[in-house]
A protein has these predicted regions:
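Conserved class I S-adenosyl-L-methionine
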Residues: 1-43
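Class I SAM-dependent methyltransferase SAM/SAH-binding core
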Residues: 51, 57-101
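A conserved beta-strand element that flanks and buttresses the S-adenosyl-L-methionine
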Residues: 114
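Short catalytic micro-motifs in class I SAM-dependent methyltransferases
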Residues: 117-121
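A short, conserved alpha-helix within the catalytic core of class I
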Residues: 122-134
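Short glycine-dipeptide loop
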Residues: 138-145
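C-terminal alpha-helical "lid/dimerization" subdomain adjacent to the S-adenosyl-L-methionine
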Residues: 146-198
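Core SAM-dependent methyltransferase catalytic element
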Residues: 190-214
Length: 214
């Protein structure tokens, strides 16, 4: 069991998570659109191996299962995982805190690694370090990482939105900052806005991105 101080928030939220994202008129107003865009950008084919970080209640995982993918998923919340197992019983799910020791379930390579409304829990240097680790250790050569999240085109847009006062424990993406941070790491990120405060990143080694991406 993780000792992450954020865990109680998600344990308490699990039972009402799906209802809350469907009725929200703010950040999660584009929730279904984000899910659809992550799936579209991933461009999967049946039989592909997909890893989801922060699987939550399984809303994204079940979409990849329905497309014939082999799905693995991790989350630090037992309550969230219990719901995800009901929705996507075919998926291989494990308890794991991204800030702690990574599960042996990740000791393999995947065609796609995806995350949705998860990585804003980490500051930008941690995000980029995590992306580098995933590419180096867990992504197949021609694979992609696709991330849907609270995100803005620029740091200025994020500042103008007032997002920096929403939650002091969260760190929201700005595409310009992210692309600059990836410079020199061998990664390149492409960003597609979905709403005024959400969007999807496709991340891959620069040589692969430049030769064509979803």
């Amino acid at each position: 069991m993780t000792d992450n101080p954020r865990l109680p928030i998600f344990e308490q939220w699990a039972g009402r998570y799906d209802r809350s994202v469907q009725t929200d008129t703010g950040i999660f107003a584009s929730y279904d659109e984000i899910l659809a865009e992550v799936v579209r950008a991933a461009g999967v084919k049946a039989g592909m191996r997909v890893l989801e970080l922060g699987v939550g209640t399984g809303n994204l995982a079940q979409r990849f299962v329905a497309l014939g993918c082999e799905v693995w998923g991790v989350d630090f919340s037992p309550a969230m995982l219990a719901i995800a197992r009901e929705k996507a019983p075919e998926a291989r799910l494990a308890s794991m805190d991204l800030t702690g020791e990574w599960s042996p379930i990740l000791d393999q390579h995947f065609d796609r690694i995806v995350a949705n409304f998860v990585l804003h829990e980490f500051d930008l240097p941690t995000k980029v370090a995590m992306l580098e680790r995933l590419v180096r250790q867990h992504l197949l050569t021609d694979g992609l990482i696709v991330v849907g999240d609270i995100a803005f085109p620029t740091a200025q847009a994020r500042g103008n939105s007032g997002a920096e006062s929403w939650d002091e424990d969260e760190s929201y993406w700005a595409a310009d900052e992210t692309m600059a941070a990836c410079t020199g790491t061998g990664l390149e990120a492409i960003f597609k806005p979905v709403s005024w405060c959400t969007g999807v990143f496709v991340v891959k080694p620069s040589s692969i991105i430049s030769s064509g991406s979803p």
